[in-house]
């Protein structure tokens, strides 16, 4: 059985698909391995896909030492659209089609994010305040005062741009929100 194969301590990388939470992945590994000693190194949004490092058994003890490096994210954004969740899956709250921006202007705007920045975590995030996740407050229609935090953006590059949408790659510190 698979549970016998998982009676080990270690770290595995799982390519988390869209529409699955990081905890869903942990639950699947727990069932497959027959152990509760499973964790993950950082949360990926449910609609994000990518590598999610999973610790099994005693490997969980090294999480604090491994989860400090720079993380790299690749994504896309649409200009002129604002949603209540700050991502494409939220309800549109504002649109603007009357804008003109070229690649040079976009590169300059992105450049301002490089280095150490102050960032207010979004309401639709797993950050806990008062023992409750911010997205739980948001789903109840409540807002919570969230203090800004320092984040470090090592690299922020535009990969492609068509005048309205662009692809980007960002290398950033743990705890940075990319929306």
Predicted features along the sequence, with ranges:
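Catalytic/RNA-binding core of pseudouridine synthases
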Residues: 2-179
């Amino acid at each position: 059985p698979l549970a016998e194969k998982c009676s080990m301590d270690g770290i595995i990388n799982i390519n988390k698909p869209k529409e699955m939470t990081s905890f869903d992945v942990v639950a699947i590994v727990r069932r497959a391995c027959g152990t509760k000693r499973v964790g993950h190194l950082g949360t990926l949004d449910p609609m994000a896909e990518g590598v999610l490092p999973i610790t099994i058994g005693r490997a969980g003890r090294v999480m604090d030492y491994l989860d400090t490096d720079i993380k790299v994210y690749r994504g896309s954004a649409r200009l002129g659209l604002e949603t209540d969740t700050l991502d494409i899956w939220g309800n549109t709250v504002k649109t603007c089609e009357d804008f003109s921006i070229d690649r040079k202007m976009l590169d300059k705007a992105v450049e301002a994010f490089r280095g150490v920045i102050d960032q207010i975590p979004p309401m639709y995030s797993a950050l806990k305040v008062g023992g409750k996740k911010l997205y739980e407050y948001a789903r109840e229609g409540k807002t919570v005062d969230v203090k800004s935090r320092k984040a470090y953006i090592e690299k922020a590059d535009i990969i492609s741009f068509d005048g309205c949408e662009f692809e980007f790659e960002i290398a950033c510190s743990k705890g940075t929100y990319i929306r």
